[in-house]
Amino acid sequence: VPTMFSRMLKLSEKEKYMYDLSSHKYAIHGAAPCPEKVKHQMIDWWGPIIYEYYGATEAFGFAYCNTQEWLDHPGTVGKIVSGELAVLDDNMKELPLGEPGTLWFKPTSEFEYFNDSERTSEAYSEDKKLTTVWDVGYTDSDGYLYLTDRKTFMIISGGVNIYPQECEDLLIPHPKVFDAAVFGVPNDDLGEEVKAVIQPIEGIAGDEKLTNELLDYLSQHLSRQKIPRSIDYIDKIPRLPTGKLYKRLLRDKYWGRDSSKIIKQ
């Protein structure tokens, strides 16, 4: 997963080049979109051997690209090579090229989530002809797919739709950040505000100085409403065994949905 790339890139130059990589012919990654900066750095290091894919067991679709395709279409997760994709708005109307919407696929068979009929129902369109895992993205004129974020992670702050992945993609490659998560937390005036939770690199203190440095860095790349209102620090960002970010565990603490105490205030 891209997180592994980010962590490897933070190795010292000596550690990066102490092994003979001549037998390393292929590197395949998926599970989450890779920040463009990270992908470029990995290609510079390993060469044109990196392949990317996108797919979900439930969604009946699969996208793929090799290194050159990605360089020609930076940020893509690949071209759909299996399945029928539709990019739709909230009214189930097809969107034009380049405009983000929910990704829906035509199922080839039925599926259901174990002991979760509500989630199963939400994954299907009303006519049962399409299914989704609520990823948001768009396609370009060449048919390449780009992911924006998960719809369930979208932050609505003061009527503005904010996708946290954009901020995460900037934070994770930062030299003082080992891992990061960005999500919405309650705000009485705005509905939600942007929160960042950071796992600093070992030896780096999660203090006001680092917070100011990170916010200043983000302000050079993001519009004001996309910048976190606050940053908390944590010993370890929770991830699933696959490397996927366990964002719900972090969000639930702030929304009062469990008694998690994993965040250091």
Say what each PLM segment does:
Residues 51-57, 77-79, 183-186, 232:
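Beta-strand->loop->alpha-helix junctions that form or flank phosphate-binding loops
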Residues 220-244, 263-265:
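AMP-binding/adenylate-forming catalytic domain of the ANL superfamily
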Residues 26-29, 182, 232-233:
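Hydrophobic/anchoring residues in structured secondary elements
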Residues 252-265:
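Acidic/polar alpha-helix N-cap and adjacent early helical turns
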